C-alpha cells in the first residue's frame, strides 16, 4: 500500500479561488477586507513568513497592512500599534508575528488583540467560544492549523465521524485546540491527546484511524507503529543535519516510510502548512463578511 497524498498546496489554491470570489462580492459594496501583520525585529524566517502572507493577500484581493518595529522596541510601542489596528476599519483581521523578543510579555500582547480581528484564532476569548460551542455554527475565528487540517481531510473525502483520532502534541496552536474542533457535533470524531510524555504512544498509534503529529520530534512516528490504512497528518517541524550536505534541513514528526502503511498522508512541507495560511485568509474574509452581511 502506498498512501494517497493529502495535497495542501492544491487544496489551498482552491480555497484562495473561492475567497477571491467572496472578496469580489464585498468589493461590489465598496468594502475591501484587510489583513494586518505586526513584525518586531528582522528575523529572516519571520520576515519571509510575513511576506508570504502578503503575497496570499494579493492573490485573493485583500488589502495588506504592514506594521514593523525595530528589535529593541518596547512593549508599550507594540501595544500602541495593536491599539491602532484594533481601531482601524481597514483592518478586518491581523496577526502579531511570533516569536516576540524575550523581554516582551507575549500572552499580554495577544490578549490585547480585538477578538473579532484575531486572524490566528488563538485569542483566549475565541478559544473559550470553541470550548463552549459544541453544536451551533461558530461565529468567531477558528485556530488556523486545526481548521486547515479538518478542511484538508474533508475536501479529500476522508470521513472523521466516529473515527479514532490521535493528536500528538499539546501546543496552543495545534494540539490543544485540535480536539475541540474534532469533537464538535458536525465532525464527531473521538480524540485522544498524547504528547512527548505519553508512555503508551506505540499502543495508541496502533489503534488510531487518524494521526495528527505536532510534537516537533523528528520521525517520532514510525511505519511499524502505524495502524495499516491510517490517515497521517505531519504538522511537526524540526531542523536536523543533512548527512549529504552537512547543513540543516527541515523534517517532520512522521517517518516518510509510513507512507507505505497509511491510506492517506500529508507531505511535509506542502501539506498542512499551505492550509494554515489559507485559513488565515478565511478568518479575515469571514470577519469582514460578518460586519457587512451579519452572517456566521
Curated annotation (Swiss-Prot):
Annotated Gene Ontology cellular component terms: cytosol
Q: Which domain of life is it from?
A: Bacteria
Q: Where does NADP(+) bind?
A: 169-171, 196, 237
Q: Which InterPro entries match?
A: Aminoacid_DH-like_N_sf (IPR046346), NAD(P)-bd_dom_sf (IPR036291), THF_DH/CycHdrlase (IPR000672), THF_DH/CycHdrlase_cat_dom (IPR020630), THF_DH/CycHdrlase_NAD-bd_dom (IPR020631)
- Coiled-coil residues: none
User: What does the sequence similarity comment in the record state about its family?
Assistant: Belongs to the tetrahydrofolate dehydrogenase/cyclohydrolase family.
Cite the record's note on assembly: Homodimer.
Give the HAMAP family listed for this entry: THF_DHG_CYH
Q: What is this protein called?
A: Bifunctional protein FolD
The source organism is Kocuria rhizophila (strain ATCC 9341 / DSM 348 / NBRC 103217 / DC2201)
User: What are the top taxonomic ranks of the organism?
Assistant: Bacteria, Bacillati, Actinomycetota, Actinomycetes, Micrococcales
Q: Which gene encodes it?
A: folD
